[in-house]
Amino acid sequence: MAASVRILGIDPGSRVTGFGVIDVRGRDHFYVASGCIKTPADAPLADRIAVIVRHIGEVVAVYKPQQAAVEQVFVNVNPASTLMLGQARGAALAALVSHKLPVSEYTALQVKQAVVGKGKAAKEQVQHMVVQMLGLSGTPQADAADGLAVALTHALRNHGLASRLNPSGMQVKRGRFQ
């Protein structure tokens, strides 16, 4: 039987950071946990970052993932929002690295393509596919579903057929090894 790998996926946000934990055994994906880390909207930025770092540390301590994946920041129309999102993402990365976890990063487009099959998918489509892929009985909150989608993306890109066919680490682009 294939060894199990536990992956923590993070969807960073300055107000709500979603997380999802899955186990991967061979080609199968199993739900472990998911949730949202909510920061007080009226708190100073340093306090909000501390909440993110502390809670991600708690998730790592409880679920003991072996790998982590984080969604990359997209550039928003509002520079202040983009900066705050980047700081929340930095807090998440710092928390993961401080626990010596290997971290991979994926764009929102890569996550949507991996989970739904198209990069322009709506949040509801991502939630639906997360439920289907993990056999969940209910629909997780949007941010938690995004965290699970990031973990699934990492699993599909690194523990799927392409990685077994290509152990040398070559990249696959447009269906071809490069």
Swiss-Prot record:
A GO molecular function held by the record: magnesium ion binding
Pfam families to which the protein is assigned, alphabetical: RuvC
Binding site for Mg(2+) 1: D11, D143
Record CDD domains: RuvC
Enzyme class: hydrolase
GO aspect biological process, one term: DNA recombination
Presence of the UniProt keyword Aminoacyl-tRNA synthetase in the record: no
GO cellular component: cytoplasm; Holliday junction resolvase complex
Subcellular location: Cytoplasm
Catalyses which reaction(s): Endonucleolytic cleavage at a junction such as a reciprocal single-stranded crossover between two homologous DNA duplexes (Holliday junction)
Cofactor details (free text): Binds 2 Mg(2+) ion per subunit.
Metal-binding found in the keyword field: yes
Entry cofactors: Mg(2+)
Annotated Gene3D superfamilies: Ribonuclease H-like superfamily/Ribonuclease H
Domain of life assignment: Bacteria
Keywords: Cytoplasm, DNA damage, DNA recombination, DNA repair, DNA-binding, Endonuclease, Hydrolase, Magnesium, Metal-binding, Nuclease
Enzyme Commission designation: 3.1.21.10
Residues reported to bind Mg(2+) 2: E71
Active site: D11, E71, D143
PROSITE patterns assigned: RUVC
Protein family membership: Belongs to the RuvC family.
PANTHER family: CROSSOVER JUNCTION ENDODEOXYRIBONUCLEASE RUVC (PTHR30194:SF3)
Function in brief: The RuvA-RuvB-RuvC complex processes Holliday junction (HJ) DNA during genetic recombination and DNA repair. Endonuclease that resolves HJ intermediates. Cleaves cruciform DNA by making single-stranded nicks across the HJ at symmetrical positions within the homologous arms, yielding a 5'-phosphate and a 3'-hydroxyl group; requires a central core of homology in the junction. The consensus cleavage sequence is 5'-(A/T)TT(C/G)-3'. Cleavage occurs on the 3'-side of the TT dinucleotide at the point of strand exchange.
Subunit-level organization: Homodimer which binds Holliday junction (HJ) DNA. The HJ becomes 2-fold symmetrical on binding to RuvC with unstacked arms; it has a different conformation from HJ DNA in complex with RuvA. In the full resolvosome a probable DNA-RuvA(4)-RuvB(12)-RuvC(2) complex forms which resolves the HJ.
Name the record gives this protein: Crossover junction endodeoxyribonuclease RuvC
Organism: Neisseria meningitidis serogroup C (strain 053442)
Gene that produces this protein: ruvC
